[in-house]
Amino acid sequence: MWFFESSISITESGVLQGMTDCHSHLLPSVDDGVKTEKDTFVILDEMERQGVRKVWLTPHIMEDIPNETVMLQQKFQNLRQEYRGKVELSLAAEYMLDVLFEKRLQQDDLLPLEEDKRYLLVETSYFNPPMDLLSTLKRIQSKGYYPLLAHPERYEYMQMKDYKHLKEDRISFQLNVPSLTGMYGKHVQKKAEILLKAGMYDYIGNDTHSVDFYLRLLQCNIRKKVAINLANRNRGFD
């Protein structure tokens, strides 16, 4: 069985070496992520030791956490001025596909990941799809953005046919590395491995919310075959 195969810790595997982390909650005191600047710097120092090259700070924006773009930009500038490490920092946001998002999209009041294209990191409920998901994603595209679906392996309502349909519609996928370690459960782990093997992921992230979470991730095991696949794919994620 797949879960009896040899494994290695995330730290020992070296899969984070050279990584661009496209999903994190390291901007302090703006959502359910890191609460203090000190904790942010502890995580960034450890990321630097692991060889992480760049981190996108992607705070939540949703009806329950209605962060304002200007406020996030100001907090990010303050953080970057205080940071003395070598990891490159950039600001974007993770958007829940809800009523607030529709308003922000209409106003073009958004924080995209500006890599080679303007990607919008978006998420849905883990259990229930939003109404007209595909229509919403197509509206994002019509505005000149590229939808980047956060941690698709975690959506219980999605099956392989759903992932294939989304890829056919040019929707990009972002892998949560913790999914490959079983931190979210074996079912999510298996889905993540299948999607990775199928080459469906476009970007990766750790979705770090706290010091404890990140340190635990580093000690978690990943199957060696999966680690090799991730390391090889990681070269194409940047």
Regions found by a protein language model. Name each.
Residues M1-V87:
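An N-terminally biased module of ancient metal coordination in phosphate/nucleic-acid-related enzymes
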Residues V34-T36, D64, N128-P129, Y155-M158, ...:
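Acidic-and-aromatic substrate-binding clefts and catalytic sites of carbohydrate-active enzymes
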